[in-house]
Amino acid sequence: MILNTEQSMVQEMMRNYAQNQLKPTAAHRDKTHEFPAQELKDLGALGAMGMTVPDEWGGAGMDYVSLVLAIEEIAAGDGAISTIVSVQNSLICGITLAYGSEQQKQTYLPKFASGEWLGCFCLTEPHVGSDASAILCKAERDGDHWVLNGVKQFITSGKNAQVALVFAVTDKQAGKKGISCFLVPTNTQGYLVTRIEDKMGQHASDTATITFEDCRIPLENLVGQEGEGYKIALSNLAAGRIGIAAQSVGMARAAFDAAVQYANERKAFGVELVQHQAVGFRLADMATQIEAAHQLVLHAATLKDAGLPCLKEASMAKLFASTMAERVCSDAIQIHGGYGYVSDFPVERIYRDVRVSQIYEGASDIQRLVIAREVAQV
């Protein structure tokens, strides 16, 4: 795919910022678990926190191809930050734009798009991951308020977000059609951060357990219509999966670049590693896999921009890119030898960061199920 002028400018701008500002400090954030508050403000100023939000709502008004290019470049600098940016764009801004009332758009979108307010997506629960229809968190009417009770788990930015998009059961008898979506300011009484996960990677991105204890919000905080929550959640997961695929490509590319640099500097048997055919062949395979995944991502994003169905293509991109990224990062470690296993070199961190891409926003086997159902249709 040949990028247009605007897309190329976005790619170059984000690459410059990520390589100069995010990459040099990524290891520090990984070790200290420091939340990237300033970096997110910077990205907001660059338009990266609401890229597809129209100008009238304070966004950059760009296409989805530009968004995935930005996510890929950010991920090449710091995978943890790219997760926050992907969720903010694909899920938080995407849902508010598509389903929010005019008042909700006026109140929330400009602050989401600028990065002033960070959002978190509260769908997963302790016993519910892939089967979103089985959530237990409930919301009950009480006068002019909804009262939320329940627990959400593995919530990206759950501690640091200003607003949560929460999915809860409003009609237990209605099954999938009894789930609704709500905007919940995180400073609301009854919104409790009860656990911060100690994760394998992506340490700069907090992942929290959120407990709702008689959390009262106004009736007007309902997003869309009552009972639309399941549809809302699933309608934007395809977009989210393209974003995760893009970040997988970015992290794989970072590991590949580190491997190329190391292979050109390190000598074995009197010559640089890159001169050994085994290493050269490994690099060739890595480069081919990265490019294939990159093109899958762009294809899915192009379909989305055209308003065409992209469920299958989004799942293909996420499945292939996330699997590819782990393999490429593993190969990058192998090229580094023992140095690849220690934190002095970035490939150890990138490998830990990339592993979750096969789990969140739909595990790999869920993507296979989606693809199988789509290709089996006659």
Language-model segments: residues:
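A short core secondary-structure module
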Residues: 145, 149-193
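Alpha-helical interface subdomain recognition
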Residues: 1-87, 99-104, 111-116, 131-132, ...
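Short Ser/Thr-interspersed hydrophobic loop/turn segments at strand-loop and sheet-helix junctions
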Residues: 47, 71-75, 168, 184-189, ...
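Flexible, small-/acidic-enriched active-site or ligand-binding loops
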Residues: 134, 189-218
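A short, Trp-centered hydrophobic/proline-enriched beta-strand micro-motif
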Residues: 115-123
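Short Gly/Pro-enriched turn/cap motifs at secondary-structure boundaries
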Residues: 112, 127-130, 154-157, 171-173, ...
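Conserved hydrophobic/aromatic beta-strand scaffold that supports enzyme active sites
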Residues: 120, 134-138, 145, 163-167, ...
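A short, charged helix-loop
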Residues: 210-232
